[in-house]
Amino acid sequence: MSELSGELKGKHIVLGLSGGIAAYKAAELCRAMVKEGATVQVVMTEAAEHFMTKVTMQALSGRQVFGSQWDDTAVSVNGEGIANNMPHINLTRGADAIIIAPCSADFMAKLLHGRADDLLSLLCLARPIAEVPLILAPAMNREMWANPATQRNVAQLKQDGITVLEVGEGDQACGEVGDGRMLEADEILADLIAFFTPKSLLGQHVLITAGPTYEAIDPVRGITNLSSGKMGFAIARAAAEAGADVTLIAGPVSLPTPRGVKRVDVKSAQNMLLAGVKYADVATIFIASAAVADWRPANPADQKLKKDGSDGLGGGVPQLSFVENPDILATIAQSPRGKKGLSGEQGGLFCVGFAAESQDLLSNAQAKRIRKGVPLLVGNIGPATFGQDHNALLLVDANTVKELPQASKRHLAQQLVADIAARLGQKT
């Protein structure tokens, strides 16, 4: 099991399958949840067994799979025998959540009306509502999803306190294209991890810059750096999981957008500044993790420079002159709201800077924090961690230095988000 695994450790999940072609994705979801440390108890409807076998789900979950309330060999989530042969009661006792994936239009309608004519609907109805949340991953044809009856059902289920995940869009098994597809297993897993994450940043709007910038020399060449953006993207994911509204301003990287995050793609430092100033107006926390180029070519060519001089520009090695790029962190941190954030005033923007150094990390980080005018500066040794999945961080404020030892960037991002929430006086 990898270091990133274990985010569902200790969780007991009842995975329900209703009938639908998307049942094949449930196999991958089951495997992924088990890999993350969860105990997974699978319950299938009769219709689901037309699309996926019990043998497959039993092999992946490592547990007996149930399909009928009359199964007389039932065991509970905790592995104990059910002496009273009431799996619709016992399977949910001690469970942390029930997730139905796929959840068909028919099964949603059944839940809405409180019908209980099979084991899966029975255990959903009999679950302790305050203790065992119910999560649905819809899967159906686009017309079925768009049908007013389905949309009314979804709205009422949400009003009843049931979590209904969004649907995917794209090619469907019937040959049509549109929304209504069940999310992919990794998307559902991410949503499930977020569901269990304490909402320490609920009500906050976090603005994050990530990745490198690209400064053009001519239309096909430019100057950039080795930043992968992985740290910033990990922070964006962790902040969204903690309940924040997150806007991620990303330089030129090829990373997937974290679930629940609004992404704004930019290229140059000037582009990033314009976007940063725009979105800082509504943000309450600004985290500047991007590796912004300090300089840019003063006069980028409007056509490709030719070595042989055929472009009429003389050929040979181009003579480049540079101008300084805008200081994005300082510009936002020294704004009126940024200054309020530094002093801890109400309505301020709490700014967090990053320093990627090659040596003398502590002294350089301390100096940069003062120079930029931010309450918190995060330092790391850049050349050793660019593009890597692991890092070590140093959190520097006016009075203390806190070391976050070598760990995955995912784990470090979670630690950083928890630290920021604590500094803002919110529960972690």
Task: Show where each model-derived region lies.
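A cross-family phosphate/adenosyl-ligand binding-site feature
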Residues: 1-136, 141-428
